[in-house]
């Protein structure tokens, strides 16, 4: 597995190889780290790339543990970070 990829296991036990788009840390919700990713080769019904995000905790043995984003406020913060990055890339 490449360094900029992770494997996500969905609720049905299916594995999805995903490209890491970006990671960031935020103190607003208890000094959490977040990863925004996109399943490789998967698109929505309009043919657009799919994006998702999760919180994660770094650990030595496994490299990290993914955690669900717990609140609407937390999702809004992640969406704001994603939009800021997208705007910056669009401006380049």
Curated annotation (Swiss-Prot):
NCBIfam families xrefs: PRK13678.1-3 (NF010216)
InterPro entries (UniProt xref): UPF0473 (IPR009711)
Protein name per UniProt: UPF0473 protein BA_4613/GBAA_4613/BAS4281
Family to which the UniProt record says this protein belongs: Belongs to the UPF0473 family.
Disulfide pairings: none
Source species, domain of life: Bacteria
HAMAP family: UPF0473
